[in-house]
């Protein structure tokens, strides 16, 4: 069985849509960035840390998603004012979303990531406040969800599921590890 080390409902939905046999066991870790840590170094460190306790008999997968603008990481907002600040910063601009994938199986640890460009509408403070009140994006990096109707995303380039928080194109590259966990597969 696959063990998904994540609390994200979006990651759960994506794995369910792939018809995989998995269970959720999230690991709580300190997601603080280190001083002068490059965004991709941070992504790798956090994605692999989320793998948590290793089990040689199970396939463990973990993910982390970061929003990066001007080489600065925008994590999940801690409160309403921080969400406003992030969305004002992203308004009318383009940023990059990186999602990292940590995999542990048979004593081997691997990391891969994908990136997507996201273009935002130009929003005023009232539009931003209404969005936050309606969607409560406090569990999302950058304070937004690409899937939110009437959200701030104007367009994007790259993988939709990557922006949701699961780098599916990278996951597919490891199909030899996970194909036996397809429901109904006796391989």
UniProtKB/Swiss-Prot annotation:
Please give the organism: Leptospira interrogans serogroup Icterohaemorrhagiae serovar Lai (strain 56601)
Q: Check the record and name the InterPro entries matching this protein.
A: ITPase-like_fam, Maf-like
Q: What is this protein called?
A: dTTP/UTP pyrophosphatase
GO terms in the biological process aspect are: nucleotide metabolic process
Q: Which domain of life is it from?
A: Bacteria
Source organism lineage?
A: Bacteria, Pseudomonadati, Spirochaetota, Spirochaetia, Leptospirales
Q: Which family does it belong to?
A: Belongs to the Maf family. YhdE subfamily.
Citing just one GO molecular function, the answer is: nucleoside triphosphate diphosphatase activity
The prosthetic group or cofactor this protein requires is:
a divalent metal cation
Q: Which UniProt keywords apply?
A: Cytoplasm, Hydrolase, Nucleotide metabolism
Active site feature: 64 (proton acceptor)
Q: Where in the cell is it found?
A: Cytoplasm
User: Which HAMAP family does the entry mention?
Assistant: Maf
